[in-house]
């Protein structure tokens, strides 16, 4: 299996086991859900009437005042009272076996390859850290929305792209299913292709 680099027009041989893998929609969905759930902090929490400070003494007598009866100033009906159905901290993390995760990444990368959304370049380097120059480089390739995968992310490439919503840049060790699916194109360098093959083997 071969792919042509868009800059030098040279042929690059690809591993069929990685770039021509059968698409498994169920596994990809599971990997995406697991990744997104593991990113959740789960810190949302409120206090119930039993946890709010104060409220031990009955505010006024049960009878004789003409007011509605009240047993505590920390009732959920009161200002500064507890929350009726208070949410608590919870752990949203899920487990996905390494083999399953690798197969999900193979499925996504192979589908990108089949649909023509995987773009290979011989190298990707910016002369400086300016966003304007980074955009100019992407416009020359006629790519308006992309994830760029490099073997190692340089400082100029990182600084030039970090303020842009339509582009993201990462190295091979930090690729994830959500980023691979979020962008229209995935631009990969030749050096990164070799590392991806080693990592997903």
UniProtKB/Swiss-Prot annotation:
GO molecular function: rRNA binding; structural constituent of ribosome
Alphabetized InterPro entries for the sequence: Ribosomal_uL4, Ribosomal_uL4-like, Ribosomal_uL4_dom_sf
Keywords recorded for this protein, A-Z: Ribonucleoprotein, Ribosomal protein, RNA-binding, rRNA-binding
Gene Ontology biological process terms from the UniProt entry: translation
Cellular component per GO, a single term: ribonucleoprotein complex
Coiled-coil stretches noted in the UniProt entry, renumbered to this chain: none
Region Disordered, annotated ranges: 42-67
Complex formation: Part of the 50S ribosomal subunit.
Protein family: Belongs to the universal ribosomal protein uL4 family.
Annotated function: One of the primary rRNA binding proteins, this protein initially binds near the 5'-end of the 23S rRNA. It is important during the early stages of 50S assembly. It makes multiple contacts with different domains of the 23S rRNA in the assembled 50S subunit and ribosome. Forms part of the polypeptide exit tunnel.
Protein name listed in UniProt: Large ribosomal subunit protein uL4
Source organism of the structure: Legionella pneumophila (strain Corby)
Lineage per the UniProt record: Bacteria, Pseudomonadati, Pseudomonadota, Gammaproteobacteria, Legionellales
């Amino acid at each position: 299996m071969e792919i042509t680099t868009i800059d030098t027009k040279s042929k690059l041989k690809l591993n069929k086991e990685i770039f021509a893998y059968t698409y498994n929609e169920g596994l990809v969905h599971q990997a995406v859900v697991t990744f997104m759930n593991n990113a959740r902090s789960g810190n949302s929490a409120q206090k119930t009437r039993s946890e709010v400070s104060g409220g031990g003494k009955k505010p006024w007598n049960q009878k004789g005042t003409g007011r509605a009866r009240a047993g505590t100033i920390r009732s959920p009906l009161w200002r500064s009272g507890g929350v009726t159905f208070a949410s608590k901290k919870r752990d949203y993390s899920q487990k996905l076996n390494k083999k399953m995760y690798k197969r999900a990444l193979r499925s996504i990368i192979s589908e990108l390859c089949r649909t023509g959304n995987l773009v290979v370049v011989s190298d990707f380097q910016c002369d400086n850290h300016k966003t304007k120059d980074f955009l100019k480089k992407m416009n020359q390739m006629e790519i308006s929305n992309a994830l760029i995968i490099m073997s190692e992310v340089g400082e100029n490439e990182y600084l030039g792209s970090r303020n842009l919503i339509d582009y993201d840049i990462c190295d091979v060790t930090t690729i994830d299913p959500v980023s691979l699916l979020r962008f229209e194109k995935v631009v990969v360098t030749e050096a990164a292709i070799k590392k991806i093959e080693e990592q997903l083997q």
